[in-house]
A protein has these predicted regions:
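Short glycine-rich beta-strand segments
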Residues: 40, 95-103, 126-135
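Extracellular/lumenal carbohydrate-interaction signature centered on repeated Trp-anchored short motifs
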Residues: 52-92, 156-157
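Residues within well-ordered beta-strands of beta-sheet-rich folds
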Residues: 91-97, 107, 127-129, 165-169
Length: 182
């Protein structure tokens, strides 16, 4: 495609079972279009008798998904994330709204074990990691994080927030007052 954006609508084929997910999709907004990201349970019936249920979250990122996904245990192994930057961005800006479940329960459903609820809170988040990457003469690839954006939303945002800005912080931010350990 002719875009820098990647989405999690991947075609997967774990254990020889073919399945497509559509948790990120276009949605009309005013005169344009935005990306709607959903989290939901996808079900696959195998040979008419085995139900496999997987919890899938919508994502939007810079990069692409390497398809088909053969292994759900390491999703980052099938994602090529990132695009080169030559300048020092100050922030990420977006229009957003969110529907966040107020319950303090999280569902784990991988498709290969029973669904399990545990204590926690499923929260949408925005994150950006700016890295300097290089390869040595032996082919080893290295990355050093130089900039970070990370924000979670623990409550619903029912109305659109336009031009929402999240600053990019450079250097070691672990001792800064705005640092969050998540």
């Amino acid at each position: 495609s002719n875009t820098c954006w990647g989405i999690s609508n991947a075609y997967a084929s774990p254990a020889g079972i073919d399945k497509g997910a559509n948790t990120t999709q276009p949605e009309k907004r005013g005169n344009g279009t935005c990306a709607r990201l959903d989290t939901r349970i996808e079900t696959v019936k195998v040979l008419g008798c085995i139900d496999i249920e997987v919890c899938i979250a919508g994502t939007l990122f810079l990069g692409k998904v390497i398809e088909p996904a053969k292994n759900v245990n390491d999703p980052y192994s099938i994602i090529s994330m990132g695009i080169p930057f030559s300048q020092k961005p100050k922030a990420i800006m977006l229009d957003l709204k969110a529907k966040v479940n107020p319950e303090r329960k999280v569902l784990r459903a991988t498709g290969f074990s029973k669904k399990k609820w545990f204590e926690g809170h499923d929260e949408p988040e925005v994150y950006v990691y700016l890295q300097k990457r290089w390869e040595d003469e032996k082919g080893n690839i290295y990355a050093k994080r130089i900039g970070t954006v990370r924000q979670r939303f623990d409550k619903s945002i029912p109305e659109w927030k336009n031009n929402y800005r999240i600053d990019i912080h450079y250097g070691d931010i672990t001792n800064e007052p705005y640092f969050k350990s998540y």
